[in-house]
Amino acid sequence: MKKKLSRIIRATRTRKRIRSLEIERLVVYRTSKHVYAQIISSDCSNVLASASTLEKKISNKVNFTGNKKAALLVGKKIAERALKKNIKKIAFDRSGFKYHGRIKELAESARKFGLNF
């Protein structure tokens, strides 16, 4: 329980800082089996774009949806959808997770395909 609570406290602290920037944020969440990404508006009221390993187009390309390759595909897809809506500059909200492994892979993939953060 302490590990989860610490992550939630880190996430809350990060979101507080990001809200002061008043730009869209890329929120990333991961479970043992899936990776989720959403771009949320600066006033925190609307989801502007989303992608996850639950989508058939992504899950069909990989054998297991909880790995780095799947996170790379989610990063690519979220970047494409953001650029379609003319969103180029965002803040990266890792939801208290370490910038390592799948989270890092998703972020680098989103940067590679055109998002700036």
Swiss-Prot record:
Gene3D superfamilies (UniProt xref): 3.30.420.100
One cellular-component annotation, GO: cytosolic large ribosomal subunit
Keywords assigned: Ribonucleoprotein, Ribosomal protein, RNA-binding, rRNA-binding
InterPro entries linked: Ribosomal_uL18_bac-type (IPR004389), Ribosomal_uL18_bac/euk (IPR005484)
Pfam family, one: Ribosomal_L18p
GO molecular function, one term: 5S rRNA binding
Membrane-spanning intervals of the chain: none
CDD domains (alphabetical): Ribosomal_L18_L5e
Protein family per UniProt: Belongs to the universal ribosomal protein uL18 family.
Subunit structure: Part of the 50S ribosomal subunit; part of the 5S rRNA/L5/L18/L25 subcomplex. Contacts the 5S and 23S rRNAs.
UniProt protein name: Large ribosomal subunit protein uL18
